[in-house]
Regions:
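Divalent cation-coordinating acidic motifs and surrounding scaffolds
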Residues: 1-357
């Protein structure tokens, strides 16, 4: 569990009390909706685009994020800012049993100066001393004049229990949804990532996982078809969960290309556990507007009138929209963490194999 002692040092009694109360509520929700971590039997894997995750969050938000992250064994995080202050504060709350591996920040306007990271619990997950960025061959351009990904996919080797795997996280280019060339680039980024990793999986005879923010609007698009190709697949238990805050888009996904013996199954076919965790059931709820109103910047209360072009005070409905779509998404995120539970103890299968030799 994360460190809670820093809450005692908060001088504002109202704030410290609220954090403690909301953490209790959040913990109850997590207990109900996320399986408990095990010592050796399972791996709780997640991906979370934490919106512009830098040094821009209130202390209470970091406590809430740490509480959620702590319930997983390995989590891929996208949209980390160039400055690592936010990530380092998160790690200090998670404690010494946690570690992270992070990319360099991207250059150019398309990448937004972002980083990606894997955050993992060292009690369960071991780094196998390999980390790399995926660089395409010179002839493999995505669209004319675009020779590489906007944000380079990041691949790392890990082991959890019996399960050795390489895992790559992505934040696929989005742009404007109505722009045909941008849609083509988004599709080709997914295709090229899948092609690259599927070839590696075949050549190395090793399991690969591809996860992150693919900016896939729904499961019936060419984007999803591209992701589920070249022997990559997504369990239905994952696909059925939209992952944006409005629960209308399937932006985030977790795909697998597995190289295990037939008896060694990662998934529970009868009762596969997966989901998208909606933290707004416990924190930054719709009815919490009045709690956080005093923390809004002055610009949150005024807007330029479309007719007069003069600044005017926002209506209460406009302020509510700001809280729901902007303020709380920059404190937590506009994405929900998408997760899946994997089976990683193959002791019985291995012993059965030895017995039959």
């Amino acid at each position: 569990m994360p460190y809670y002692k820093p809450i005692k040092r908060i001088k504002d009694k109202e704030e410290s009390t609220r954090i403690a109360e909301r953490l209790l509520t959040l913990r109850r929700q997590l207990d109900e909706q996320i399986p408990r971590k095990t010592a050796t039997d399972t791996l709780l894997l997640a991906t979370w685009n934490i919106r512009e995750f830098g040094d821009n969050r209130r202390t209470e938000s970091l406590h809430f994020i740490a509480e959620i992250v702590s319930r997983f064994d390995l989590i891929a995080v996208q949209e980390i800012s160039r400055k690592l202050d936010g990530l380092e504060k998160l790690m200090s709350l998670l404690g010494p049993n946690w570690d992270y591996i992070v990319t360099d920040s991207t250059e150019g306007t398309a990448g937004g100066g972002e980083r990606m990271a894997f955050v993992y619990d060292k009690n369960k997950v071991t780094f196998r001393n390999m980390a790399s960025e995926i660089v395409l061959a010179a002839k493999a351009e995505l669209v004319p004049k675009d020779l590489q990904f906007a944000r380079t996919p990041f691949c790392v080797a890990f082991q959890a229990g019996w399960f050795k795997f390489n895992i790559a996280t992505v934040h696929i280019f989005y742009g404007k949804a109505s722009d045909t060339q941008i849609e083509e680039r988004r599709l080709n980024e997914i295709k090229k990532a899948v092609e690259f990793l599927s070839k590696r999986a075949k050549d190395e005879d090793l399991s690969y996982i591809l996860l992150g923010d693919f900016n896939i609007p729904n499961c019936k698009t060419d984007y999803m078809k591209a992701l589920e190709s070249k022997k990559f697949f997504i369990p239905d238990a994952i696909k059925e969960h939209p992952s944006n805050l409005g629960k209308s888009k399937h932006y985030d996904q977790i795909a697998f290309n597995i190289k295990l013996e037939a008896t060694m199954e990662l998934f529970d076919k009868k009762n596969q556990k997966a989901g998208a965790f909606d933290f707004t059931e416990s924190v930054y709820k719709a009815e919490d507007l009045e709690i956080y109103r005093k923390f809004f910047p002055p610009t949150a209360f005024t807007v330029k009138d479309t007719k007069t072009k003069e600044m005017r005070d926002k209506t209460e409905k406009e302020i509510e929209k700001y809280y729901m779509n902007d303020y709380r998404t920059f404190e937590m995120s506009d994405h929900l963490p998408l997760w899946v539970e994997l089976k990683i103890d193959f002791s019985n299968q291995y012993l059965e194999k030895l017995k039959d030799q």
